[in-house]
Curated annotation (Swiss-Prot):
This is Probable chorismate pyruvate-lyase 1. Its main location: cytoplasm. GO terms for biological process: pyruvate biosynthetic process; ubiquinone biosynthetic process. It comes from the Bacteria. It comes from Burkholderia pseudomallei (strain 1710b).
Amino acid sequence: MNTSSGWSRQPPASLSELEIHWLFAPGSLTERLSALGEYSLEPVDQRHAAACAADASLLGVEPDSPIWVREVVMRLDAQPCVTARSIASAHALETQWKPLTGYGSLPLGHILYDDPAIVRAPFECALLMPDDPLDAISRRYARAAAPPRARRSAFVRNGATLVVSECFLPQFWSGFAQARLAGA
């Protein structure tokens, strides 16, 4: 995956052990969050758009190609804790990722971890930059002095790529991550 804009498979030296734990935790984030409190997922936006240069690079398409974008906020005990942005090429959505078209408020994990044809790439993490598309949605739910911590991973099904990026908001770090680390 493209490592521009600060994204890397290696955690920045400034991250704490707790942050590294959550940014590189394997498996379903939905399951991990559900163990910490009352979990809910709220769709923020789902649309077709023209791929910006960064999205095009991640998906292996030309800039301005049609892509599908889904943005959600995940809440614990009614507090926004994680924002997520998923992207796929329009062609991939029409073929290999067709089940995602009407997914609404269901977590993507329900299909990503039950299909043996889906292969997950290693995580990348970043301190989000203001020009990152995930930063825009994250700033709607939290203002932070420090850059938000985020992770992303590509899921590939029969050659079609879906990229899921997740930003852990300050409310997550202060209210849930450390207090319940042992159970996660």
